[in-house]
Structure formats: C-alpha cells, structure tokens
C-alpha cells in the first residue's frame, strides 16, 4: 500500500465501504534491485530450512510463550544505541579512522598518547583538527573528519576495555562540543546536501554502494555520537557538562541553522532522498540522527508527562488521576490466545462433551482476572460471519445465568494472586454528561436544555446520583481547553486580544515543518513501507540499502549470511527510528496545541498510514520480536576492543542469547501507539480499522506476552467492538474480559454493544472535512500573517507617530493633489481644538 502522493485517502462516504485491501504479501522481505539475496537462499536445501527454522525459533503455534522482561523507555541502553549506528559492512572503517588520526597526531605530538595528554593539550589538538575541516581539498577534509570521528569514538586504540572506551567517548565528545565542532559539521553537512555533482553521479549509477556516501556517513556519525552522548546523563558527569547539555539542547531546537531548527535540515534530506534526487544519502544514519535530535530538543516520555502536569496546572485543570507510565510498568501480561491447533482440539472436545463445555464457558466468562485469554477461541482468520458450531443456539452468557449452575468456588490460594481493582481511574467527558442529561430530560420531562449540566429539576433521585458520580470522574483534557480557546479567538478576534504564543521547542519545530509537513509525512511512510518485513521489492520502490551494501557483492556463503543479517538489522533500525520520530512528534504537538497534532495526524491518515501499520502487523509478530538479526562480536565497541573470532555459519545462526529483540518490540509498541493516536475519538478512522479487517491481525499480536503491547492492542480492539457485530463478541468473550480488565473505562461508554449513537453509520467524510476546516482556520490565524484580515490588524492612534511616518503616494494622486485638498480638506469643517486635545 503506497503512501498517497497528496490529497485525502479513501475515507468512507455515505456508509459505502471500500473493498478490503488485497491479501498481504508474504512476511519475507525481498531486497531491492542490486541487493544481495537472502542468506538462506544461498544455502543447500536442508541447511536453508534449518537456518529459517532457527530464525523463527519458538515463535509459531505456541500459545504459552514466556513473559518478556521488557521495560519501555525513550531509548535502549547507550551501548546498544551506539552499535546500531554502524552497519557490519562499515567494520573496516574503524581502523581507517584510527590511521587518519594517528598520522596527524604524530606530526604534532611524538612522545605521548592521546590518553596521556592534559586537558589543555587535548583542547589545542581538537581546535587544530577543527581548522583542518576548512581546507578546500576534499580528500584532506575527509581525512581530518575521520580523525575527529576517531576521537568521538573514544580513541579506542589506546583502551583495553569497553567501559574505558565509553568513558573516553564522553570526555572527548564534550571536548569537541566545547571547541565548536558541531556547528562546523552542520556547515559541512549543508555543503554536502547541496553537492550537485555527487547527487547527479549517484542518480546515474545503476547500483549504489557504501562508497558513494562516505563523506556524508563520516559527518553524520560524528553528529550522532555528539547528540546521543550529550543527551544521556550519567552519574559522575562534571558540573560544566550539565550546563553545556542545556545550552546544546536550546541551540539544537532554535532556528539557528538557515533560520530553521536543525531537525528541518534532516527532514529536507529525507524528502530529497525519497524524491530520487539524492539516492546516495545514508538514510539509516539520517533517521537515527533525526530521532535523537527530536528527542534531545523536545524531551522524552517522562519529561512529556511532567510538562503535561505543569500545563494542566497553568490552565487551572485538576491534576492527572494517575501517572500512566507507572501504571503501565506495574501491569502484568495476560496469557495469549490459544493457537489454531489448540482451537481444533477444543472444538473436538466440545463435540464430545457439549454440556460440560457450556458450564466451563460460563465459569470462565465471569471476569477471570488471572488468564483472561485462556481457552479463547482465536482462529487465524476471523470474519464477522464466522459461525462457531459450539455456540449455535446458545443464549448469551448474561441471559442464562438463572439456568446455569453457580460458578465453582476457587481455592483461597488462587484468589490471592488476582489483582485487586482496575488499574485505571474511569474518566467522563463534559459531552458525555450533557448527552446523559439530555436523554434523561427528554425521557422523564419531555424537554431539553442544551448544554446545561447543572439543572436537575424534576429528574428522579437515581438520576441525581448518576450525575453526581459522573461529575466526580469528569476529566477535561488540555486538548478540549485549547479547542475552546481557539473557538473564542475566531468568534471575537478583537476582544480576545493578541494571542501570546510561547516559543517552546515544539512550537519552533512546528513552524519549521508547517510549509512542507505533508511531504515530510509521505517521505517517512515511504521509507517505513520499504523497510517493513512484509514488503515486496518493486521496481519503483526506493532503495534504502545504499549505506549497507558493499562495493563488491559477497562471494561465499558465510559472507552472504553475514550480509543478510546486516540487511535485516538495517531495516529493523530504520523502522525503530521512524516509529519513534512519529510518536514523539504526535505527542509533543498534541501537548503544545491540539490542532498541530490534528494537522500532522490528518496528513498521516491521508498518506495511508493506517493500512500501512496494519500491513506491518500482518506477519508472524512473535517471529519478528524474537528475530536474532545481530552479530554481537561485530557490535561496537566490542569489535574495536577485542580480537574478532573467526565467524562460522553456526555462530551466525545462533545470534545472541536474548529472549527478544529490544528494538523490534520497541518499534511494535510505537506503531500501535501511533495507530491508537490516529483513531482515538475518530469514528471515520475507526471504521477504516474495521474495513481493513484489523481485528484478527490485532488479536494475533496478543500472543506477545508483554503488558504494554497488549494494552495498546486491546485499546484498538475496544474502539471497534461496537462495529464488529454480535457474533464476533460472542466468539471473543475472553478478549472482551481482558479489555474490561486492562483498558480505562469511560463511564456511559457503551463500547461492547452497538447501541451508541456514535456507532451508527453517518457520513464520515463530513467529520474529516469539519476537522480539516478547523485546522486550516487555526493555521491561517496563527501563522499566515500575510493573509490576515486588515480590519483586525492593530492601528496606531498616536497623532505624532502617524504624522511622522513617510508615506509613498501614487503618481496619479500627486498629479491631482490640489483637487483632493479642495474636496477633502478645505470644503469640510474641522474642529482643530477637539482634534489636538
């Protein structure tokens, strides 16, 4: 599903649902033209099957997978984030960097190592290297850049352990930052972006390799190491380093680079790459640097939570009912649904013992808090019209409570393990209270009072109690307040006064993104599509492997296997970076102003982001999360400190010993959160989830036993349940119970049934059009000063300043000046005393 090249995507009009997408491609990604064949394809038949089997070890057909000890955070561990910057193909360049540094260093210092010099000598040599970046000869400049990269990599040739390398990295990078290296690198990067000769040469080449992006890769490596290291706070950091960190963050988010924040330059590189004008750009490094730049300037998720609490207090709203990060961390994963083979066995048992099966079904329906998915019938492909034979003629569980025997008493020990209470405090919107009161008034009194939520005259006592409970759990979001304030500005532009827009980093970034935001979103989604494991190689798809393919293709099976792992790892890192960038931007824009968030979200929807994410999840997700596409002995800094052992096919197949791949689980959670943000309270987009048959895809993702991932899957299933029909709900009672357990409740939200007014099939196109009109009015009012209404512009009423202004009069007026003077001045009486008072 290609991201759209422009206008709105296929929304549902007048309840005419578009046809579902064609069957998804197989879950094995084919590399673009010029890429190496998958490693397994070069092996003999039995060996290839064994290799593929090991790659998918313990990921198919096992409902009882172990709990994943995964803690969601802004980033992975520092060492892991550093190692993912380099592809394994770049390995030989570490020694090249060292050689360039030592050749230059020995000219100036003959008797000492870098680690033996004092701070002043370090600073002197760093400034000498910086001066070397200003030479015009490209080869000399590249050698100096490599020497600086070696310093930023921790001068590993003089270190004996990984910890020592990381310690010297921090010291060296703050030293480089102090002497002004980053700004010099930005200028060089700008020059390389505009290097027309390199771009035209790359466009003409049939196959682009690592050598075409050497200059860019060296610059981006240094900049990434600086941003990533300065952003990370460590115990034992010097006091001046904290000051430098704050200054660097402020500069990085300010419009200091071509009057734009640095992130806009990187977004420009992404769009230039996707347009085909610069196919040699090393996109993985650009996206990683873009992610870390956005993270450094805007702040991570914990910082976002504190900013949200602060903003609520400024707007006079009550504090948040709970810290969502802490609640999610304390949640436990539920058992995943049974596999298809388990379902067949269950159906056979039901055929033999139908009566007992019904009793067991009822017992388990009573909100089993320990294993809400246990014995859930999760077939691989579920449709609305599926008929489960064991449920034919069966009444709904709640309707047969009188007939069925009471639930069996569980032992007391079992009860002790059950979580007490629900994890989230319920919420109610002002709109929900209004709707409840309106329906109650029309039912009991026969009148309505609009948006009045206080008058309860004539309503029965139970209704009073209900309203009291609803108001106790009333939650007003920052977005609602911002939307109301925007309506007020548009309704009364004069009395409202001038809006004071605080220039926080998110505001500065949005102003930079605004002119080309649709193009940026389309470009990111194009790269995400190319990197997704379910994508097939197409002749017109972009080649994202320019910075991983060597100049000479591998000639042995072992080299092919190594390159196959490298290519898969490369794609996984790209997915990780894009998912993190999109989620960070959505969350920060929503906090800064709701219409900034809606503008970005709407363009993601128009570019087919929803079906793209569903296509990503339409694979064996356990296989993706447990994939072992890494070679730990080749990871930095291990590879520069220790002697490399001889690689064998067995060691490559074994991969690492981790239970799961951190970056892949992180990417999956991010994509689910993005999907949740795009569809929340948007019925037209929720219908897209239904039309694209997302329910079975999402249910398969519940097999991953990780609480946070399960929570966001259940949220996405919850918004659809009212549209999926009675049969789906009957067949998935365990999933319904899990939603009740783990997802926040909205009082009066009839999510489990189709009775809600919002669930009825309206013209959903109108909903998107109204939202788009609000967004355009907001952008025009706040940012489009050139087209603002002249009647509402401020007027200078001071006589002296007005008379002192120089006015350029048109020629025809000057020629007829006497006539104007006679008509407008001399023939009209003027009370000069009143005028001058």
UniProtKB/Swiss-Prot annotation:
GO terms for biological process: cortical actin cytoskeleton organization; negative regulation of hippo signaling; regulation of cell morphogenesis. Keywords: Acetylation, Cytoplasm, Phosphoprotein. The modification Phosphoserine is found at residues 59, 335, 339, 788. GO terms for molecular function: protein-macromolecule adaptor activity. Residues 378-391 have a biased composition (Acidic residues). Residues 36-46, 333-343 have a biased composition (Low complexity). Signal peptide: none annotated. Residues 796-837 are annotated as: Required for STRIPAK core complex formation. Part of the core of STRIPAK complexes composed of PP2A catalytic and scaffolding subunits, the striatins (PP2A regulatory subunits), the striatin-associated proteins MOB4, STRIP1 and STRIP2, PDCD10 and members of the STE20 kinases, such as STK24 and STK26. The STRIPAK complex can be extended by adapter proteins such as SLMAP:SIKE1, CTTNBP2 or CTTNBP2NL. Interacts with CDC42BPB. Interacts with CTTNBP2NL. Plays a role in the regulation of cell morphology and cytoskeletal organization. Required in the cortical actin filament dynamics and cell shape. Part of the striatin-interacting phosphatase and kinase (STRIPAK) complexes. STRIPAK complexes have critical roles in protein (de)phosphorylation and are regulators of multiple signaling pathways including Hippo, MAPK, nuclear receptor and cytoskeleton remodeling. Different types of STRIPAK complexes are involved in a variety of biological processes such as cell growth, differentiation, apoptosis, metabolism and immune regulation. Belongs to the STRIP family. This is Striatin-interacting protein 1. It comes from Pongo abelii (Sumatran orangutan). The lineage of its organism: Eukaryota, Metazoa, Chordata, Craniata, Vertebrata.
């Amino acid at each position: 599903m290609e991201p759209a090249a422009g206008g709105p995507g296929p929304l549902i009009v007048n309840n005419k649902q578009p046809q579902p997408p064609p069957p998804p491609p197989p879950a094995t990604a084919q590399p673009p033209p010029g890429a190496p064949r998958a490693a397994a394809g070069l092996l003999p038949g039995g060996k290839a099957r064994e290799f593929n089997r090991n790659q998918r070890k313990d990921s198919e057909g096992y409902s009882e997978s172990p709990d994943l000890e995964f803690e969601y955070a802004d980033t992975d561990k520092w060492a892991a984030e550093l190692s993912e910057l380099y592809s394994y193909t770049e390995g030989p360049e570490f020694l090249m960097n060292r050689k360039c540094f030592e050749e230059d260093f020995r000219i100036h210092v003959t008797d000492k190592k870098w680690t033996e010099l004092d701070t002043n000598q370090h600073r002197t040599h760093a400034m000498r290297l910086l001066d070397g970046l200003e030479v015009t000869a490209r080869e000399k400049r590249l050698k100096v850049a490599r020497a600086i990269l070696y310093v930023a990599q921790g001068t590993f040739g003089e270190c004996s352990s990984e910890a020592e390398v990381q310690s010297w990295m921090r010291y060296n990078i703050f030293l480089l930052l102090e002497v002004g290296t980053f700004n010099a690198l930005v200028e060089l990067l700008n020059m390389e972006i505009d290097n027309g000769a390199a771009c035209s040469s790359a466009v003409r080449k049939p196959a682009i390799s690592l050598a075409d992006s050497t200059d860019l890769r060296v610059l981006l490596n240094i900049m990434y190491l600086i941003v990533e290291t300065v952003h990370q706070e460590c115990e034992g950091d010097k006091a001046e380093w904290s000051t430098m960190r704050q200054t660097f963050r402020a500069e990085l988010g300010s419009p200091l680079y071509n009057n734009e924040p640095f992130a806009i330059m990187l977004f420009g590189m992404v769009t230039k790459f996707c347009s085909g004008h610069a196919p040699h750009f090393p996109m993985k490094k650009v996206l990683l640097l873009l992610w870390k730049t956005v993270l450094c300037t805007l702040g991570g998720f914990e910082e976002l939570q504190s900013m949200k609490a602060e903003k609520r207090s400024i707007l006079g709203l009550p504090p948040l009912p709970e810290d969502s990060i802490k609640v999610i961390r304390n949640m436990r994963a539920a058992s995943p649904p049974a596999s298809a083979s388990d379902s067949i066995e269950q159906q056979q048992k039901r055929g033999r013992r139908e009566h007992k099966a019904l009793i067991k079904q009822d017992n388990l329906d009573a909100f089993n808090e320990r294993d809400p998915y246990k014995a859930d019938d999760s077939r691989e492909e579920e449709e609305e019209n599926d008929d489960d034979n064991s449920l034919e003629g069966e009444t709904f569980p709640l309707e047969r409570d009188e007939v069925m025997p009471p639930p069996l008493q569980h032992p007391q020990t079992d009860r002790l393990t059950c979580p007490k209470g629900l994890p989230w405090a319920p919420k109610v919107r002002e709109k929900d209270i209004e709707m409840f009161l309106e329906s109650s008034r029309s039912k009991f009194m026969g009148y309505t009072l609009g948006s009045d939520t206080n008058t309860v005259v004539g309503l029965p006592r139970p209704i009073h109690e209900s309203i009291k409970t609803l108001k106790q759990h009333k939650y007003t979001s920052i977005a609602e307040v911002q939307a109301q304030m925007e309506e007020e500005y548009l309704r009364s532009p004069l009395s409202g006064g001038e809006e004071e827009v605080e220039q926080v980093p998110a505001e500065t970034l949005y102003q930079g993104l605004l002119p080309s935001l649709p193009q940026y979103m389309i470009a990111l989604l194009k790269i995400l599509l190319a990197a997704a494991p379910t994508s097939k190689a197409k002749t017109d798809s972009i080649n994202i492997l320019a910075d991983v393919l060597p100049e000479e293709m591998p000639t042995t099976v072992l080299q092919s296997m190594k390159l196959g792992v490298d290519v898969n790892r490369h794609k996984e890192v790209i997915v990780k970076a894009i998912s993190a960038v999109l989620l960070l931007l959505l969350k920060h824009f929503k906090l800064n102003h709701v219409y900034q968030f809606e503008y970005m979200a709407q363009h993601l929807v128009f570019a087919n982001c929803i079906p793209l994410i569903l296509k990503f999840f339409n694979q064996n997700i356990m296989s993706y999360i447990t994939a072992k596409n890494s070679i730990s002995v080749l990871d930095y800094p291990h590879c520069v400190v220790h002697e490399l052992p001889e690689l064998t096919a067995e060691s490559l197949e074994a991969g690492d010993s981790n239970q799961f791949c951190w970056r892949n689980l992180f990417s999956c959670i991010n994509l689910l959160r993005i999907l949740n943000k795009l569809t929340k309270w948007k019925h037209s987009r929720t219908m897209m989830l239904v039309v694209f048959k997302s329910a079975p895809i999402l249910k398969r993702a519940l097999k991953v036993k990780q609480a946070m991932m399960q929570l966001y899957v259940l949220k996405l299933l919850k918004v659809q349940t009212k549209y999926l029909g009675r049969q789906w709900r009957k067949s998935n009672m365990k999933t319904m119970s899990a939603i009740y357990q783990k997802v926040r409740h909205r009082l009066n939200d009839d999510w489990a049934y189709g009775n809600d007014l919002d669930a009825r099939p309206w013209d959903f196109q109108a909903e998107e059009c109204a939202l788009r009109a609000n967004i355009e009015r907001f952008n025009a009012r706040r940012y489009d000063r050139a087209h603002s209404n002249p009647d509402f512009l401020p007027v200078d009423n001071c006589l002296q300043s007005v008379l002192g202004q120089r006015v350029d009069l048109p020629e025809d007026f000057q020629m007829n000046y006497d006539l104007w003077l006679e008509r407008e001045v001399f023939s009209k009486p003027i009370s000069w005393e009143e005028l001058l008072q």
